[in-house]
UniProtKB/Swiss-Prot annotation:
Alphabetized InterPro entries for the sequence: Fusion_F0_Paramyxovir
Modification after translation (UniProt): The inactive precursor F0 is glycosylated and proteolytically cleaved into F1 and F2 to be functionally active. The cleavage is mediated by cellular proteases during the transport and maturation of the polypeptide.
Family: Belongs to the paramyxoviruses fusion glycoprotein family.
Coiled coil: 142-170, 466-491
Cystine residue pairs: C76-C199, C338-C347, C362-C370, C394-C399, C401-C424
Location, primary (coarse class): virion
GO BP, sorted A to Z: fusion of virus membrane with host plasma membrane; symbiont entry into host cell
Source organism of the structure: Newcastle disease virus (strain Miyadera/51) (NDV)
Residues with a covalently attached lipid (S-palmitoyl cysteine): C523
Name of protein: Fusion glycoprotein F0
Subcellular localization, as worded in the UniProt entry: Virion membrane; Host cell membrane
Site residues by UniProt (Cleavage): R116, F117
Ranges for region Fusion peptide: 117-141
Length: 553
């Protein structure tokens, strides 16, 4: 039950895996396509799988440093074995003393225990300075104290065996594997062969192999003499000590071969010495390795920017360095919580940041939505390689093709030039000669131009210049405001008091009333005058008719 609990997936990791599975139900759209972005100076350099991990699995590896020789060959190997044994004791005694001092610092009194615990740590490091990592290592060492004691009770049987690899389970709280790199050599060379070897050859072969192993031990523990028990051993050091037998422990702890190659480069598999016994030459190391959950539908996409030509000068695109995509959602990924390898990201937590609609539109292929910053310096490399091809700003540097010979020119308005093996086989840039083997397919957009509205300033010097211009504009506006105030000051304030305003209003109303009355009177007089004119005209016409009638009569 105890060994099974050591490999159980922790609750936080299980919760993260369930979240990842839920996200995996979202149907994936096409991944971030860098081909339309290359001509705009935005290059997708690669993808990495995103994994979540926690360091929770532990197991012990007991390294048998002194091999058992066959009875008929003990006399021949006695001299090199005795010299090897003395050297081992000299090399590893500081390690054993350091482990013993830290483990003996544990007492039953809480406060006393803490003081002795810290004192043991400070006493075992150079200059009395204990780092957080060393305190953590010491804490782990004390927690493994009981397991180390149980291993020591079995030391005689472990030392007496001729097996190169076997499990040790009697009374141990976690998986333990006893391995012997030198015992493996002895078994292969002497125990499992019928070939007769003379004593001189046996002495020579054993001596050479023991010296080589001592060299590896010195490489592992030599730099750690100042604080030997508090420095973690890397996976490379563990393989040096245990040889290929290290795989047996890792496999027992549930680490598959498909994960092993990636985890080796991550540095997440570490070991801490927990015991050293000089009598039997046994070295115990507690191995810690992570529980890893793979987020199947999440990967990190890395972006790089190349200097591009604009009408405002040279600039670079404002895009995140790393983005992640799940379904149709693209967000910036914070990798400060992650450990990177060539193919994977191992993160203790996933932290993402939303992007503005403009950047999102830019990364999905709409290059007219991309924004650029005039922050590229004169020494910035104006080119980058991509899968055997080159993306270069041929306005900043001379793009000279050696095969076929010629100069590659960049058309007016183009941001960068896409150069592949179809346009040039051997390219020379700033004295660097590159042989091109890749090609840009039809999906790579060309002749992309950057508009003035897409270029902004973000550099300190550029911002200072813009602030200076803004300050000048503000100063001019203040001068105009002062002139306006001076003109307003010349106005007689006494004419603008309350009583004067009331008088002005009353006079204005009276004037309006008089004007209206005058207009009405004028209209009345005009109407009356027209009526009189009509009456006179009628009388005249009537008199004329009477005179005509009289004349006819």
């Amino acid at each position: 039950m105890a060994s099974r609990s050591s490999t159980r997936i922790p609750a936080p990791l299980m919760l993260t895996i369930w979240i990842a599975l839920a996200l995996g139900c979202v149907r994936l759209t096409s991944s971030l396509d860098g081909r339309p972005l290359a001509a705009a100076g935005i290059v997708v350099t690669g993808d990495k799988a995103v994994n979540i991990y926690t360091s929770s699995q532990t197991g012990s590896i007991i390294i048998k440093l002194l091999p058992n020789m066959p009875k008929d060959k003990e006399a021949c190997a006695k001299a090199p074995l005795e010299a090897y044994n003395r050297t081992l004791t000299t090399l590893l005694t500081p390690l054993g003393d350091s482990i013993r001092r830290i483990q003996e610092s544990v007492t039953t009194s809480g406060g006393r225990r803490q003081r002795r615990f810290i004192g043991a740590i400070i006493g075992s490091v150079a200059l009395g300075v204990a780092t957080a990592a060393q305190i953590t290592a010491a804490s782990a060492l004390i927690q493994a104290n009981q397991n180390a004691a149980n291993i020591l009770r079995l030391k005689e049987s472990i030392a007496a065996t001729n097996e190169a690899v076997h499990e040790v389970t009697d009374g141990l709280s976690q998986l333990a594997v006893a391995v012997g790199k030198m015992q493996q050599f002895v078994n292969d060379q002497f125990n499992n062969t019928t070939q007769e070897l003379d004593c001189i050859k046996i002495t020579h072969e054993v001596g050479v192999e023991l010296n080589l192993y001592l060299t590896e031990l010195t490489t592992v523990f030599g730099p750690q003499i100042t604080s030997p028990a508090l420095n973690q051993l890397t996976i490379q050091a563990l393989y040096n000590l245990a040889g290929g037998n290290m795989d047996y422990l890792l496999t027992k702890l549930g680490l598959g071969n498909n994960q092993l190659s990636s985890l080796i480069g991550s540095g997440l598999i570490t070991g801490n010495p927990i015991l050293y016994d000089s009598q039997t030459q046994l070295l115990g190391i507690q191995v810690t390795l992570p529980s890893v959950g793979n987020l199947n539908n999440m990967r990190a996409t890395y972006l790089e920017t190349s200097s591009v030509s604009t009408t405002k000068g040279f600039a670079s695109a404002l895009v995140p360095k790393v983005v992640t995509q799940v379904g149709s959602v693209i967000e910036e990924l914070d990798t400060s919580y992650c450990i990177e390898t060539d193919l994977d990201l191992y993160c203790t937590r996933i932290v993402t940041f939303p992007m503005s609609p403009g950047i999102y539109s830019c990364l999905t292929g709409n290059t007219s939505a991309c924004m650029y910053s005039k922050t590229e310096g004169a020494l910035t490399t104006p080119y980058m390689t991509l899968k055997g091809s080159v993306i270069a700003n041929c306005k900043m540097t001379t793009c000279r093709c050696a095969d076929p010979p010629g100069i590659i020119s960049q058309n007016y308005g183009e941001a960068v030039s896409l150069i592949d093996r179809h346009s040039c086989n051997v390219l020379s840039l700033d004295g660097i000669t590159l042989r091109l083997s890749g090609e840009f397919d039809a999906a790579y957009q060309k002749n992309v131009s950057i508009l003035n509205s897409q270029v902004i300033v973000t550099g300190n010097l550029d911002i200072s210049t813009e602030l200076g211009n803004a300050n000048n504009s503000i100063s001019n506006a203040l001068n105009k405001l002062e002139e306006s105030n001076s003109k307003l000051d010349k106005v007689n304030v006494r004419l603008t008091n309350t009583s004067a305003l009331i008088t002005y209003i009353v006079l204005t109303v009276i004037s309006l009333v008089c004007g209206i009355l005058s207009l009405v009177l004028a209209c009345y007089l005009m109407h009356k005058q027209k009526a009189q004119q009509k009456t006179l005209l009628w009388l005249g016409n009537n008199t004329l008719d009477q005179m005509r009638a009289t004349t006819k009569a």
